[in-house]
């Protein structure tokens, strides 16, 4: 009984940490990544489509993203979508491809980004702790319904706390890695 509750908790906590990693991919560091353009939608035959579904995205240099649309007529549409996204960079095209050169981040902007990263990490830790609370509540209900003994409950609570500590440490690790990436000049 307790194993299922703990396994379910681990799965939910892992999803929280994965969600943080995905959010961090969208945060601009000094380096170019195609993840910066993940949220951009382009009008394609009347439907808003993700940029990655209408063009090939690549990072040929550390501060440059190239976008190669599958149809040349999409170039102005893609440029407009990038400009409307307010990401802080301007696309340039040569008729076949669109190049985005990322300007270097200022020290002030880097510190703002780190502050945002820390808030995102803290929100994830809160989510992990809420999952712990729900797990412990489930275990207490099992004990109340006499499906597990009081000793089993205490052992399971300790295991739940250990699992929670592990996932909080993972969040810290992800934050530290991204922080280093942002502060790297």
Swiss-Prot record:
InterPro entries: Ribosome_recyc_fac (IPR002661), Ribosome_recyc_fac_dom (IPR023584), RRF_sf (IPR036191). It comes from the Bacteria. Gene3D superfamilies: 3.30.1360.40, Ribosome-recycling factor (1.10.132.20). GO terms for cellular component: cytosol. Pfam families: RRF (PF01765). It is found in: Cytoplasm. Responsible for the release of ribosomes from messenger RNA at the termination of protein biosynthesis. May increase the efficiency of translation by recycling ribosomes from one round of translation to another. HAMAP family: RRF. This is Ribosome-recycling factor. The gene is frr.
């Amino acid at each position: 009984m307790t194993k299922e509750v703990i396994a379910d908790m681990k799965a939910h906590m892992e999803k929280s940490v994965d969600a943080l990693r995905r959010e961090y991919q969208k945060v601009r560091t000094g380096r170019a990544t195609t993840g910066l353009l993940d949220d951009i939608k382009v009008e394609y035959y009347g439907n808003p489509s993700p940029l990655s579904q209408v063009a090939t995205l690549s990072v040929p240099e550390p501060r440059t993203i190239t976008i190669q649309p599958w149809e040349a007529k999409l170039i102005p549409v893609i440029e407009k979508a990038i400009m409307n996204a307010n990401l802080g960079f301007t696309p340039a095209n040569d008729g076949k491809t669109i190049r985005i050169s990322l300007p270097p981040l200022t020290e002030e902007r880097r510190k703002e980004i780190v502050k945002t990263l820390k808030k995102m990490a803290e929100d994830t830790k809160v989510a992990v702790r809420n999952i712990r609370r729900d797990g412990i509540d489930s275990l207490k209900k099992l004990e109340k319904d006499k499906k597990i003994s009081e000793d089993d409950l205490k052992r399971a609570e300790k295991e739940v706390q250990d699992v929670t500590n592990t996932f909080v440490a993972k969040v810290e690790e992800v934050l530290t890695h991204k922080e280093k990436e942002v502060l790297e000049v």
